[in-house]
Amino acid sequence: MFNQELKEFAVLNFANPPSHRRLAVVAAAVLTLIASQAQAQTAKPYFEFKKPALISIPGDLSLDSNGASAPLFNAPSSPYLMGFEGISQYDGASFTRNFIPPDTMGAVGASQYMETSNGSYAVFDKTTGARTALMSDVAFWATAGQTGANGDSRVMYNTAANRWVAVAFGNDVKDLQLAVSDTANALGSWKSTKFEGYGGLGFGATADYPTLAMDTRALYIGTNNFAPDTAGGSNSFRGTTLNVIPMSSLFNATAPTVTNMARFYTPYSNTSTTNADRGFAQQGVNSVTPGGSGTVVAASLFNEDNLVFKVNGVLPGSATSASLGAVTYIGQQAYTSPGAARQPSVAIAANRRVVSAGDERISSSVYEANGRIYMVQTVDPLNDTVDETRVHYTVLNAATMAILAEGDIGQAGYDYYQGSLAVNSFGEVVIGYNRSGLDPATGKISFMGQSFTTNASGQLVARSGELLLKESLTDDYHNGSLFGAAAVGRQRWGDYSQVSIDPSDEHKFYLIGEFAREYNNAAGGHPGGTGGSRWGTWVAVVDAAAVPVPEPTTWLMMVFGLGAVGAMARRRAALGTPA
């Protein structure tokens, strides 16, 4: 009976005590170290170059940006308060900035919501969802003082400083540019700086997949470095760089500066037997806890596990004396990298499993609150019998790095991917993600969310059911070929999503994720459109304080269960299901 329940409910898996997992990971690390003495350590081959492509489908013209959904408002008692459409691929195409995927990213501020994507930036009224500005990424960076932009943008709002912070590729993708607003108004003036993220080997380079995090001491930007070793050669992974910028260099009376920045380069070579493992897609841990050292987490280059290390010695005015602490592998439940995600694609069977669910890198922000560190990633667990992706969350003790809780959000018959989370000072956690499957009625790629609270032991206790925030408008998303055709090329999705907390009311969480818009043709409302698919983004506001607490029996099962624990059933129609 319990196994049947696991098939019908979202799954939060607390199997395998952390101490046993930690011993297993230590043993695996020792074996890996021994093996490395005789042969080269090779990074996971699917940790690949992610710079987006500016696509141009032959014959596919975008003549309008019709069809945006109106804002959605639910009853104040509903945990899903409001939803509104963000930037779409139609918007980017209007600037001839037609990138895939969007690199979905946004943050909520004092009165606005700001979104960045590959090609376009936008600002919205956070209470009504009304869009107050739309611009190309190139135009935004021009007003901030830079020339050109090339995607991979991220944005955050710093509540203590009441300022916005954005990062993106420069015109040359070896460079990173960093902008800070002068006030809390995202539509006001910004100032910026540019610095070389990774110089390469003399034949071009990319400081790929820049991450962004802030604590009370510094701002952290991690990059995955790629470069060819010959003129015209292909890009290969060359290591990572962690850039640490003290807060005083960021928020000052003039402009952001990197004069007192620390840079930690960890090289990688396919032929080396001594490659250090400081992970892939290094994510600084966001925290408002004063003092102490910074913390960085990442997926291991070699093991199916995450690792963590400290950044020590960042002074109020300088990071130049900072140093990195030793790496600790946290010892997660066994998993493998996820496969492609499913979708119904009723008309074209070949397109039913083409959408990229990504890999196990930590693609979205990581948070510390109340002495605990929270993170999510996409995995294919080895403790189930289905080849389906799950959003895996992990909670760590911030002092010891011991796992307090971990689990998989998922339901049999569906893939779950592109997760993100945020946590407030009350220990309330909201996780957003995509879900899709083969079922024609419920399998379209959907943007979903769930809320949790953290108990005294650090475990997540479900508060809401699975909330449908936005459903895709087509059952067959493929970008790179026209409507009715088989998918061509890699079907990128994401590459990330984000959750942020309203600085005016920390019970309110703003989630942003990707969905599939209608095709660019007459049937989709685009006269003269020639048939390419288009992505969209959706912003949802979830009030964690309005979410009902589970029944006592459910709570007891979730806290004290020794194996996998069933979460609450999905709640859809009662909470609003936007088309």
Question: What is the role of each PLM region?
Answer:
Residues 5, 14-16, 553, 561:
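Generic extreme N-terminus detector
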Residues 9-39:
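Gram-negative bacterial Sec-dependent N-terminal signal peptides
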Residues 566-579:
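C-terminal membrane-anchoring or membrane-association module
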Residues 33-34, 563, 573:
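Hydrophobic alpha-helical membrane context
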Residues 5, 34-36, 556, 579:
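Serine/threonine-rich, low-complexity intrinsically disordered segments
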Residues 41-547:
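C-terminal PAP-associated
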Residues 2-10:
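Short, Lys/Arg-enriched N-terminal segments with co-localized hydrophobic residues
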Residues 550-569:
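A short, hydrophobic C-terminal helix/tail in secreted or cell-surface proteins
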